[in-house]
């Protein structure tokens, strides 16, 4: 009969006849259910007496009715149910204080999620009598209503929220404190966005910086080393080149822009004093100008190269003095000439002497000799 009571209709249009079993052969009065109810109360009282002082460890029966539920006061149970109710009234009064105290402790010991489930179940199984109290009629196990969340309506969701409110002292203040950090972060983010330059500003600055750098006569490597000497951040020539070409990330462009701007201001302020300008230029790796060698001087170097492809330091010095060139220029020219000779000679072919190669200038080319033999 307890399982049948779960599926009773929710309206109050039931007849006043005693509760009948659905089978037509066996007709039972409503007092049978009330007798079972009385037995369940007596068993629960015996359990409380046996475990005196430890009633918190007990859990009420799954289908144990609440003393204030509608199953005891409903008019649809009939007149005989009223007489049975008066018979167990004394036991229920003794049970009322301990049972309510035990149930309140169980509710507070539950987690917020299980607490919310209990109230959600009470919302769907609403009392059938308008004179019922706010307590739920029956205490159900949570495993029977695992899919109840999708069935809840707007009223149930508001009830679900209201049952979580007692867990907080001030829900309004709590919600404000939770929502305030994102607003603070958003304000801080807006402030940082205002300070950061836009992409158009970076593009314009990169263009102006390149023009000013070329006008002042500094290379990209000079700027990178000068930044390391002045501000402690050494940048390579590739980094400065990528900045001017707008190939760095936006974050790195924003970091490098103020340093380059300070370097430009420092350079512009020292334009009138050559000593300071030379000092800044000396901090970087100064690139020498490309040396232009005249045709007569180049021929003299070629003749010396045919005699000695790898001259000694003394020979380089004497040759530089005779040609009125710097010693470093003559040394670099011989290095480049030897590399050129290696590129011209195929790999695996023995390298002939320089005199033999250039002494055969009057002989016909090799391809001409091959064509003559074929004919």
Swiss-Prot record:
Q: Does the keyword Transcription regulation apply?
A: yes
PROSITE patterns recorded for this chain? HOMEOBOX_1, HOMEOBOX_2, POU_1, POU_2, POU_3
Give start-end positions of Basic and acidic residues composition bias: 162-177
Please give the SMART domains that the UniProt record associates with this protein: HOX, POU
Which keywords accompany this UniProt record?
Developmental protein, DNA-binding, Homeobox, Neurogenesis, Nucleus, Transcription, Transcription regulation
What does the record give as the DNA-binding region? 286-345
Q: Which residues form a coiled coil?
A: none
State the compartments where it is located: Nucleus
The record's tissue-specificity note reads: In embryos at the neural fold stage, localized primarily in the anterior neural plate, and localized mostly in the anterior region of the nerve cord of neurula stage embryos. In tailbud stages, expressed predominantly in the eye and brain, with weak expression along the length of the nerve cord. In adults, expressed in skin and brain.
Indicate the segments forming the POU-specific domain, all copies.
194-268
- Where does the sequence pass through the membrane? none
List where Polar residues composition bias occurs. 107-117, 129-138, 151-160
Q: Show the Pfam families listed in the entry.
A: Homeodomain, Pou
Disulphide bridges: none
Single GO MF descriptor? RNA polymerase II cis-regulatory region sequence-specific DNA binding
Region annotation (Disordered) maps to 1-29, 67-138, 151-200
Protein role:
Acts as a transcription factor. May play a role in neuronal differentiation.
Question: What does the sequence similarity comment in the record state about its family?
Answer: Belongs to the POU transcription factor family. Class-3 subfamily.
PANTHER family the UniProt entry points to: POU DOMAIN, POU DOMAIN, CLASS 3, TRANSCRIPTION FACTOR 1
Q: What is this protein called?
A: POU domain, class 3, transcription factor 1-A
**What is the protein's species of origin?**
Xenopus laevis (African clawed frog)
